[in-house]
């Protein structure tokens, strides 16, 4: 019998059209069934989806389809994170308006995503640049302003003088703007802030409740929030050696914040931020210090960047009096690694027990005094090389602290300094600090959500009345020069003050695009609502049960979303505290890189051959050899990208989906390979061939589990596979589910190819097994599952079928296989009934041929049996 090959292009388009026509993926909050909300992080509309998108959205779709089959009312929406810098860059480079560029890209990417057969409720689609969306975002801004969670204050920012905008710390590379290459300036600008610090304690405490989040993400957020117990320590200043003492008048002390006051006897210097008031005062009369400060301001100010940058300091001539030993004076430095916005902008350095301080001390030849030693170490023998000792131990070289643990020493120092007085005040004070800082949301950009505030010369800053929202971006703007077009648009800026009616100016800053993505999940629950949410409907869906996205969003996006949920609850828009119950961070899609003398070479320009046991790569154009490089994340810059459209056109969406799920655990990177995608395609064709051969007979057979013989064994395999795959999908272990389905088809294939020769009981068991198989592949390869289900006589869409129920009696194992060791070395296995007692197991083991061969007349000294685990024969 000739079987026509499965044509994915034709069949996938057919089933997608049927799904659309029947609107089977549209969700109503009024539908019966337990609600389940699955959401993948929505994409930026760059113009093309990449294989990372394919993997991410396939995973979410598997969850959505599986939960739907389990009878749940599933919400699985899609939208676009559409504001941002790239659209303005495109406007400048290509003379196209950001709005036109963005919506063109959305249309192209929507078409690509729809080709994947995703079970998305497209009726809820929105882009964050839709006026309808940012109108509601402006409502939220005003609500938070009324609640005191929005403030306007002066902040130091990274200013790009060419692009004329504020840059995030991450956008400053070696002191230069990431796009313009200009030397970045540190400026003080008045900015809008969300008071995320108001929720610092709650954001930290609730991390322990997020048990369905990866531990790594929770640790990253914990460190970012950075709660620390410490001590404010006030140091008296000795300015007698200061060349320009008049510049430091009025400063008689410096307050440091430290989490390690136990190490005070190891202190050898104080370091101040370049923005510390003492540093600024000293710089007024010191040109060299001013130059040093300007140099420090040219670098990135992120904690991460400062930790890796070379430690640099400027010795001021000021000395600090040691609070526990007034006879000791420590030099005061201005240093590039001290941040003004953490603690007090001043620290004391204990080189022996902090690596940063040790690096600094080595560079400037400062004393290194060990004050904590491991408990087991001999005090006189314990030394340091180039690594600070940061472990626990006992205090040494620390006067009245000697012999205490660092924890106890902390308390003793705190009590001592709280009683000791300097200038009429306690010299020490216990305190709690957070690394978390308020979220600056002002951006000097056009393509963002306008901040709904008005500046009036008479009334000050006035919120736009809610009735006057939305503040809509003007479209008559030009991008012929850098900077913010809104700041040059006089007619848009000019508005009557809502309070006094006099001419006033609109705020020209727009919101950070992270604001847009901090609440979109809530809008999806009722995108038609006049308010930002329909609170009753939101309460039915939120929090999102399963959120899927990259670990690169572990801190900013996910932390901001958690803050926003709390802020929106305070404003009466939602009832929940947390936005996402479950979080899954998938790995990246990576690919080999190829390079020749001219640069990077794309995979489709290369042929790979095996020569002398080695893989070699040659350009298709001239057969010149290219170097096979490392496996890296797909990127346009290295040309190691694979276009999903090409894969779908060549192999079909189901093949792409199957490969994305099959090759490695979903939390790990998947290595793209042509052989891998071809293997997935062969499996698709094999499935169809088996179904097409057997369907004429099986479509007439009623499914039923076998009761005896081979039919019973087949049904056991079917029900056990169903049980295992169900467990895998619940755990998002997609690759394990795929492996089981490969094995299951291997069991069924010989029977499917000879179905006419089977007895009636086996045919019924095989029909049930195939029904199970179709149901199990449906979340992963939905088009193929529909085609197979229809060929087998299915009267409804596979996408509307319930998940099968396995028979618990058929999944019970009646035998167990145990590894058999002889003198501790494995020699083979033994299979015994689950109910076998020790004597029966011993008898079965002694009957094994490899055991008999090892005995060779010897007697068994003893046999160790660990039930259901292992057997060890000791000779």
Swiss-Prot record:
Q: Which NCBIfam families match?
A: leuS_bact
Task: Give the family this protein belongs to, as stated in its UniProt record.
Answer: Belongs to the class-I aminoacyl-tRNA synthetase family.
- Superkingdom is Bacteria
Q: Carries keyword ATP-binding? A: yes
Q: Which GO terms describe its cellular component?
A: cytosol
Gene that encodes the chain = leuS
Q: Where is this motif: 'KMSKS' region?
A: 633-637
Reaction equation(s) it catalyzes: tRNA(Leu) + L-leucine + ATP = L-leucyl-tRNA(Leu) + AMP + diphosphate
Q: Which GO terms describe its molecular function?
A: aminoacyl-tRNA deacylase activity; ATP binding; leucine-tRNA ligase activity
What's in the keyword line of the UniProt record? Answer: Aminoacyl-tRNA synthetase, ATP-binding, Cytoplasm, Ligase, Nucleotide-binding, Protein biosynthesis
Name the EC number(s).
Answer: 6.1.1.4
Query: Which Pfam families does the entry link to?
Result: Anticodon_1, tRNA-synt_1, tRNA-synt_1_2, tRNA-synt_1g
Name it: Leucine--tRNA ligase
Chief place of localization: cytoplasm
Position of sequence motif 'HIGH' region: 43-53
Q: Tell me which Gene3D superfamilies the record gives.
A: 2.20.28.290, 3.10.20.590, HUPs, Isoleucyl-tRNA Synthetase, Domain 1, Valyl/Leucyl/Isoleucyl-tRNA synthetase, editing domain
Task: Give one GO biological process term.
Answer: leucyl-tRNA aminoacylation
The entry's ATP-binding residues are 636
Q: Where in the cell is it found?
A: Cytoplasm
Give the matching HAMAP family.
Answer: Leu_tRNA_synth_B (MF_00049_B)
